[in-house]
Amino acid sequence: MAGKFSFSNFFGMTEDEDYSTDLQGTKTTDEVSPTSRPDNIISMTAAGNAKMNKIVLCEPRIYSDAKKVGKHLLENKAVIVNFTRIEGAQASRIIDFLTGTVFAINGEIQRVGEQIFLCTPPNYEIDGNLSDIIDQNDFDSEVN
């Protein structure tokens, strides 16, 4: 029957006497050999050289300064922009430019002061709303 092809033999549906063994006489020992995994080792100097996130402070004076702010955002740096030294119309144009830039990179822009804005790339998370805190502090100072 060794020369014939049988589906039941192929799928192991028949019992073969050739494979019966005495399990009591055999001993199996599983030796665990210590293995070193060099791919799990991290150098302490490499961990210390991790790239840190930066926050850049900008105070634009002309519209072309908005390009510098946009470059910082493209380099994944958060930017705090102070508009106290620029005219209202120019500040509005810069805010429009930065809003478009932040939208294009999936970042966020948030007003944190009267003329101060925080622009962040997508690897930053802005938590909370500063205007609510400012309003609450103004209310507390009026009560006291």
From Swiss-Prot:
Keyword Transcription attributed: no
GO CC terms of this entry: cytoplasm
Polar residues biased stretches: 21-38
Spans annotated as Disordered: 21-40
Any GO BP: FtsZ-dependent cytokinesis
Protein localization: Cytoplasm
Alphabetical list of InterPro entries matching this protein: Cell_div_SepF, Cell_div_SepF/SepF-rel, SepF-like_sf
UniProt keyword annotations, A-Z: Cell cycle, Cell division, Cytoplasm, Septation
Family the UniProt entry places it in: Belongs to the SepF family.
Role this protein plays: Cell division protein that is part of the divisome complex and is recruited early to the Z-ring. Probably stimulates Z-ring formation, perhaps through the cross-linking of FtsZ protofilaments. Its function overlaps with FtsA.
Subunit structure: Homodimer. Interacts with FtsZ.
PANTHER family according to UniProt: CELL DIVISION PROTEIN SEPF
Name the UniProt record assigns to this protein: Cell division protein SepF
Species name: Latilactobacillus sakei subsp. sakei (strain 23K)
